[in-house]
């Protein structure tokens, strides 16, 4: 009873409203939709194969036509020509789940150029030209000037160096000559003193003889050291 009272209390939909007119004209709208659907099928049956039925719920509204239900091959709709490289078959790009590199096929003109043998006469001519070509006089003059300039630079560097080496050698030789003369003078003086002592006193103690031999050994060692240094400088 309460539900009946609530329905009676609800206001009725006015006749001029859009919802009321749409409900009244629903069969005619359905017929026009069917006609439009049929004309669309006739006009685009050759190009499209997925159709929509507005009367079905959204989950089942799209369906595939029977002529293409079991066919998923798109080769009939796309043409792969040998000359057009913008379209490539999927089998050439994908293999075992990996993307493979695609290389463009060479055209007929490129293959003909690669297959043509090289002209041996032209290559021989080029080789003979390279061998027979003589250097120009200007280039030879430039080379001579450069070589002369390099030699002059080397001479400017070597001449002062040679002068310095000569000065060093002359200084070393004069120093060694002076040392030799000094050693000779000292040895001669000592020998004279020793000879005088021998003549004056015929008896010489053993200690004096030992010290004299020791001094002679030291002088001879010094003389040998000086000679060794002199030889090393000369080398």
UniProtKB/Swiss-Prot annotation:
May be involved in abscisic acid signaling by acting as a kinase regulator. The keyword Cell membrane applies. Keywords: Abscisic acid signaling pathway, Cell membrane, Membrane. PANTHER family: MEMBRANE-ASSOCIATED KINASE REGULATOR 6-RELATED. This is Probable membrane-associated kinase regulator 6. Residues 130-140 have a biased composition (Polar residues). One of its GO terms (biological process) is abscisic acid-activated signaling pathway. One of its GO terms (cellular component) is plasma membrane. The gene is MAKR6. Its main location: membrane. Residues 108-140 are annotated as: Disordered. It is found in: Cell membrane. It comes from Arabidopsis thaliana.
